[in-house]
Amino acid sequence: MLDRIKVCFTESIQTQIAAAEALPDAISRAAMTLVHSLLNGNKILCCGNGTSAANAQHFAASMINRFETERPSLPAIALNTDNVVLTAIANDRLHDEIYAKQVRALGHAGDVLLAISTRGNSRDIVKAVEAAVTRDMTIVALTGYDGGELAGLLGPQDVEIRIPSHHSARIQEMHMLTVNCLCDLIDNTLFPHQDD
């Protein structure tokens, strides 16, 4: 059992090192995309399933409340938090539409959709991205593996942050770290002189 624990930590560290080499440009572009949207009075819609939903919710909470420093609230909505809306849509046998319907209702040109999917193939996330495209929104996608179907939907203005791994647990860990990096970059760009 102790060896297995060491393997988990070693895999995580190796994934972090690979990501630190491969992802800074994409993370920087994503942060600037989010900052630009916020500075123009727009909002960020976030979605994911399972652990990815938790990461989406963490991002939205960090925008609305704060990340590490006190600052004004920033507009972000985690689309996976309203159980009444989610179950109403799913109850009508439209599970694939649970996020897309919300994007069509709440999203506007200039808003950003933060779509988080470990493999990039979750139908409800893919449909949300398709809906965001019809609303002239920009997409920031956190993926892994080969980026899946989601990667193929992105345009030149969109940003994919693809974790260099084929292990779901490592991808999810890196998604959380990436979300924290994005929050840190947003705070330090918009509020550079805030005290800790």
From Swiss-Prot:
Residues 34-196 form the SIS domain. SUPFAM superfamilies: SIS domain (SSF53697). Gene3D superfamilies: Glucose-6-phosphate isomerase like protein, domain 1. GO terms for molecular function: carbohydrate derivative binding. One of its GO terms (biological process) is carbohydrate derivative metabolic process. It comes from the Bacteria. Keywords: DNA replication. It comes from Citrobacter koseri (strain ATCC BAA-895 / CDC 4225-83 / SGSC4696). The gene is diaA. This is DnaA initiator-associating protein DiaA. Belongs to the SIS family. DiaA subfamily. Pfam families: SIS_2. Required for the timely initiation of chromosomal replication via direct interactions with the DnaA initiator protein. Homotetramer; dimer of dimers.
